[in-house]
UniProtKB/Swiss-Prot annotation:
It comes from Bartonella henselae (strain ATCC 49882 / DSM 28221 / CCUG 30454 / Houston 1) (Rochalimaea henselae). Its EC number is 2.3.1.181. Catalyzes the transfer of endogenously produced octanoic acid from octanoyl-acyl-carrier-protein onto the lipoyl domains of lipoate-dependent enzymes. Lipoyl-ACP can also act as a substrate although octanoyl-ACP is likely to be the physiological substrate. Substrate binds at R93, G94, G95, E96, F97, T98, Y99, H100, A173, I174, G175, G186, V187, S188. GO terms for cellular component: cytoplasm. NCBIfam families: lipB (TIGR00214), PRK14341.1 (NF010921), PRK14345.1 (NF010925). It catalyses: octanoyl-[ACP] + L-lysyl-[protein] = N(6)-octanoyl-L-lysyl-[protein] + holo-[ACP] + H(+). Keywords: Acyltransferase, Cytoplasm, Transferase. This is Octanoyltransferase. The active site is at C204. Belongs to the LipB family. Pathway: Protein modification; protein lipoylation via endogenous pathway; protein N(6)-(lipoyl)lysine from octanoyl-[acyl-carrier-protein]: step 1/2. SUPFAM superfamilies: Class II aaRS and biotin synthetases. It is found in: Cytoplasm.
Length: 245
């Protein structure tokens, strides 16, 4: 099942999404080389089947992709503005078009929600809170919005010499799929990707907000430091991990 979440208040949902007592730690895997998208998709699908068969533990997989676009189940053809700029893949997750590429930290989340909470809305809220807490470690204020999924950064945007307005830009996208209550796909966080590569699509179908990154916000950050912060924040919300990298 894929899940579309729009116009829904998630602020009241609890942040904790820990597993039942006795659940093994979540495996934490980091791949440093670029991973082709079809390879990652095959891996996730196989892992989900093994989790369902109780032959594998839950896992978070951190990686980067080469430049590409993915289309979610709600993607509209008109939102692919430059079809031949990068490879385009059908993702099977919820959401619309998004960009993946070097400088973007991908976290694929393969969790058994039956061991946690069978509530996809609460799961998405917990993923957002995970990213918000990670960003706070770098003094970035990430925010969620009722009418759109993901994590957003608000900042001043001078549109003219007379007016100073706020702009809202997305720093992290979320797109998941759930099969028999086991999740896959996950989140993408813009660390220092080439933001011009988003020009080939309408990201997530949203035209009136932009995208940003750590570098764009004036905070050049090493991917290793992002990973440490992600790990610390994950344990606060989802529980213990074991590093298998």
């Amino acid at each position: 099942m894929t899940f579309e979440l729009k116009y829904t208040d998630r602020s009241y949902l609890p942040d904790q999404f820990k597993a039942i007592s006795g659940n093994p730690p979540v495996e934490w895997k980091v791949t440093n080389n670029l991973v082709e998208y079809p390879e990652a998709l095959r891996y996730m699908q196989e892992r989900v089947e093994n989790i369902l068969a109780q032959n594998a533990h839950e896992q978070v997989w951190l990686l980067e992709h080469p430049s590409l676009y993915t289309a979610g189940t709600s993607a509209k053809k008109k939102d692919l503005l430059t079809p031949h700029l990068f490879p385009v893949y059908e993702a099977g997750r919820g959401g619309e078009f998004t960009y993946h590429g070097p400088g973007q930290r991908i976290a694929y989340i393969m969790l058994d929600l039956k061991r946690r909470r069978q509530d996809i809305r609460a799961f998405i809220s917990a993923l957002e809170e995970w990213i918000i807490q990670m960003l706070a470690k770098f003094n970035i204020k990430g925010e969620r919005r009722e009418d759109r999924v993901g994590v957003w950064v608000q900042r001043h945007s001078c549109q003219s010499t007379q007016n100073s307005l706020y702009s809202e830009d997305k720093i992290a996208a979320i797109g998941i799929r759930v099969r028999k209550w086991v999740s896959f796909h996950g989140v993408s966080i813009n660390v220092d990707p080439n933001l011009a590569h988003y020009s080939g699509i309408v990201p997530c179908g949203i035209t009136n907000h932009g995208v940003t990154s750590f570098l764009d916000l004036g905070l050049p950050t090493k991917m290793h430091d992002i990973d440490i912060a992600l790990k610390q924040s994950f344990e606060q919300i989802f529980g213990p991990i074991i590093d298998i990298s």
